[in-house]
C-alpha cells in the first residue's frame, strides 16, 4: 500500500517503493500495488514492478485537518482500499506511517502486516516546524508532529516494522518488538552512459519545490558568493520557484536546470566532478545520497545527510561554507581505484538480499 504513485521513481520515498517492488517481483512474488494518487497520474506501465495496480484518491475533507488522527494518515482512509484488502488473505506491506489508517482494523487482525518506516515521522515534522518561516506551516507541522507521536502506538498492530536506517532502528527497537533493519535495495545499478566530456562542475540535485532543498540551494549560493568559489555549480531539479530562479541567475558561475529529463539528470550525475548533497535535517536515509554514491563520484555532504547511515566514511563531510570552499578549491576527485572501492561497498551494503530474507521470514514463514 503506497502513499503515492511510485512513478517516476524520482524522489526518496517512491524510489524505495519502486525498487523494492521490482526486486520482489523479480524474485517471483505476485505484487498487488495499491497507490494513493494526488497529482502524479494513473496512466503508468507498472508491469516491471507489479502484477495488479489499484488507485485511490486522498480524502480532501476539512475534518481531516482537525482530526486527532495525523493529517497524512486521515487523508488515506479509503474504504475501497479496505474492501480490496479483505478480498484475500495475502500479507500486506504498508508504506510509511502515512498508510496505516486500516492497520488496526479488526478484520485484518489475522493478517501478516509489515510497516515500512521511511523515517521517524514525528521527528521529521518537528524539524520542519523549526525551519519554516511561515506561521501557518509552523502550526501545521507542530500539530502533525504531536499527532504522529501519539499515533505511533498503532504500530503495535504490525507483525513487523521495517526500518530504513541504523539510527531509526535504534529508536523503534526501544519502543516496539519485531523491528528489523531493511536497507534500500538497489540490485540493478544505473548503466554507464556514453556522454561527451564536460568542463568540471559540481552538482546539487533534488526536488526544488521542497522547502528543505530550496534552503540548501540558497545556502550553497551564499557560500559560493561569500567564499568567492570560482568553480561551476549546476542546480538541477523539479519546479524551482521564481525566487530561486532569480537568485541563481545573479551568479555567473551558477547554472539552473529546471525539470531535466531522467536521461539528462543521469548524464549530469555521471559527469559531475562531485556531488554536493546539502541538508540540515536528519531523517531516515537520503536516497539521493545512495544514487550519488552509485555513480562512483566524490560526495560532499553536511553531517545531517549521513547521520545514522554508516556512510560517512564514503563521503567528505563539511559543516561550514569555509570547509566547502576548502574542498572545492582543492579539486581532488576520486581516483579510479577509490571509485571502484566505493561502488563495491555500496553494492554490498544495499543488496536486495536482506529484503528477500526479511519478507520470507516475517510475511511468509509460519
In which residue ranges do the predicted regions lie?
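Active-site proximal beta-strand in glycosyltransferases
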Residues: 91-92, 108-131
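Acidic donor-binding loop of glycosyltransferase active sites
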Residues: 269-284, 295-297
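Membrane-proximal helix-turn-helix segments that form the acceptor-binding/catalytic region
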Residues: 79-86, 121-124, 132-161
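A charged, aromatic-enriched C-terminal amphipathic alpha-helix characteristic of glycosyltransferases
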Residues: 76, 333-365
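N-terminal subdomain of nucleotide-sugar transferases
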Residues: 1-52, 87, 225-226, 298
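Short hydrophobic beta-strand element within catalytic cores of glycosyltransferases
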Residues: 288-294, 298-302
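Conserved catalytic-core segment of nucleotide-activated headgroup transferases in glycan assembly
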Residues: 16, 181-250, 255-270
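Donor nucleotide-sugar binding/catalytic pocket of nucleotide-sugar-dependent glycosyltransferases
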Residues: 51, 114, 141-191
Amino acid at each position: 500500500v503506497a502513499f503515492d504513485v511510485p512513478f517516476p521513481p524520482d524522489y526518496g520515498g517512491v524510489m524505495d517503493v519502486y525498487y523494492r517492488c521490482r526486486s520482489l517481483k523479480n524474485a517471483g512474488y505476485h505484487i498487488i500495488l495499491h497507490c494513493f494518487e494526488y497529482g502524479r497520474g494513473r496512466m503508468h506501465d507498472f508491469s516491471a514492478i507489479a502484477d495488479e495496480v489499484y488507485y485511490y484518491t486522498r480524502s480532501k475533507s476539512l475534518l481531516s485537518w482537525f482530526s486527532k488522527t495525523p493529517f497524512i494518515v486521515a487523508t488515506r482512509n479509503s474504504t475501497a482500499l479496505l474492501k480490496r484488502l479483505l478480498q484475500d488473505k495475502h500479507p500486506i506491506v504498508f508504506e510509511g506511517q502515512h498508510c496505516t489508517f486500516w492497520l488496526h482494523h479488526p478484520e485484518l487482525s489475522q493478517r501478516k502486516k509489515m510497516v515500512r518506516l521511511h523515517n521517524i515521522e514525528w521527528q521529521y515534522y518537528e524539524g520542519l516546524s523549526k525551519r519554516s518561516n511561515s506561521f501557518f506551516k509552523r502550526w501545521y507541522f507542530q500539530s502533525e508532529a504531536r499527532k504522529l507521536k501519539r499515533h505511533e502506538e498503532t504500530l503495535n498492530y504490525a507483525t513487523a516494522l521495517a526500518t530504513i536506517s541504523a539510527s531509526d532502528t535504534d529508536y523503534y527497537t526501544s519502543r516496539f518488538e519485531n523491528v528489523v533493519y531493511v536497507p534500500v535495495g538497489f540490485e540493478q545499478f544505473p548503466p554507464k552512459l556514453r556522454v561527451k566530456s564536460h568542463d568540471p562542475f559540481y552538482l546539487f540535485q533534488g526536488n526544488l519545490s521542497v522547502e528543505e532543498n530550496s534552503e540548501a540551494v540558497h545556502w550553497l549560493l551564499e557560500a559560493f558568493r561569500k567564499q568567492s568559489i570560482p568553480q561551476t555549480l549546476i542546480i538541477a531539479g523539479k519546479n524551482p520557484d521564481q525566487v530561486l530562479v532569480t537568485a541563481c541567475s545573479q551568479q555567473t558561475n551558477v547554472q539552473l536546470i529546471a525539470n531535466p529529463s531522467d536521461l539528462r539528470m543521469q548524464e549530469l550525475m555521471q559527469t559531475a566532478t562531485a556531488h554536493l548533497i546539502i541538508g540540515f535535517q536528519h531523517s531516515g536515509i537520503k536516497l539521493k545520497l545512495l544514487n550519488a554514491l552509485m555513480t562512483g563520484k566524490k560526495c560532499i555532504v553536511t553531517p545531517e545527510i549521513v547521520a545514522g547511515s554508516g556512510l560517512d566514511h564514503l563521503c567528505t563531510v563539511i559543516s561550514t561554507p569555509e570547509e566547502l570552499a576548502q574542498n572545492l578549491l582543492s579539486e581532488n576527485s576520486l581516483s579510479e581505484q577509490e571509485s571502484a572501492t566505493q561502488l563495491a561497498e555500496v553494492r554490498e551494503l544495499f543488496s536486495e538480499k536482506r529484503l528477500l530474507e526479511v519478507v520470507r521470514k516475517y510475511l511468509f514463514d509460519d
